[in-house]
Amino acid sequence: MDRLDLIKRNVQEIVTEGELEELLNKKKAPRAYVGYEPSGKIHMGHVLTVNKLIDLQKAGFEITVLLADVHAYLNRKGTLEEVRKIADYNKRCFIALGLDKEKTNFVYGSDYQLGAEYMLNVLKLSRSVTLNRARRSMDEVGRAMDDPTVSQMVYPLMQAIDIAMLGVDIAVGGIDQRKIHMLARENLKNLGFETPICIHTPILLGLDGTKMASSKENFISVDDTEEEIYRKLKKAYCKIGDTEENPILALFRYHIFPRYETIVIERPEKFGGNITYTSYEEMENAFVAESVHPMDLKNSAAKYINEILDPVRKVLL
């Protein structure tokens, strides 16, 4: 897989591809970042962007991970001390998932976001962003609020300034970050900063085919036990022929195939024996043709996801 294909793998959108190609021609080692609000357990939705960072590292990018403890504090996710502890947990998880510890720059928001230069830039940006625009940006990333605090309106402004102050060329995030990233693209140049390129990954559905929610237990956390993962995937939605909103297929596409050149679906000889696939497309076609059963996919997905997450469990013990 060539450099550009690796960058574009499993990406929903690049804003813009032309700017990306120009950057690759101009810089040998471009800089990209993702910001993570340390507010709870890491789940497979977060791992999707970690996978993209790993792709970018393989493509020669310098990677920064922002552990956004101040953002979490402003979003009322705990005291600064509490969210800093969660940030440390996040960092251990990301390294165990495959980010190169020596080549990843981990930055805590509190290391620079309380400085005068940073805050002055946030205030400058606040003069050109309407309250409605800030609120829409927050709502888009799943933080819809009936009665938001001023701190939560500052959140998207800080996220835009993060891109500038970290000196990165590319902002990576889920497609739910798009409105905040567009805010940055439209406004940072007016403050004297470069316009960032944005890479957006899809948002994974929960295991039941609906939006992920902690109350539904419809997602996989990176520290789930092997037994919990087998149990959750056994109950997961995997309707024969449904390739659009199928969480089991999504696990193969976004998490398993990027890490394994060959996938073996294990099944008894009386049901045809093991099947080997070398690409996601090959496996999806077999699923549509009903030559592989949903339960066989579920069992194999559980096996591979457990292998991927085993280093995380060892680190967290």
UniProtKB/Swiss-Prot annotation:
Localization, per the record, is: Cytoplasm
Sites binding L-tyrosine sit at: Y33, Y155, Q159, D162, Q177
The UniProt entry, under Pfam families, shows: tRNA-synt_1b (PF00579)
Question: Any S-S bridges, and between which cysteines?
Answer: none
What PANTHER family does the annotation carry? TYROSINE--TRNA LIGASE, CYTOPLASMIC, TYROSINE-TRNA LIGASE
Describe, as the record does, how this protein assembles with itself and its partners.
Homodimer.
For this protein, the record's HAMAP family field holds: Tyr_tRNA_synth_type3
Q: What's this protein's name?
A: Tyrosine--tRNA ligase
- Record organism: Methanosarcina barkeri (strain Fusaro / DSM 804)
UniProt gene name: tyrS
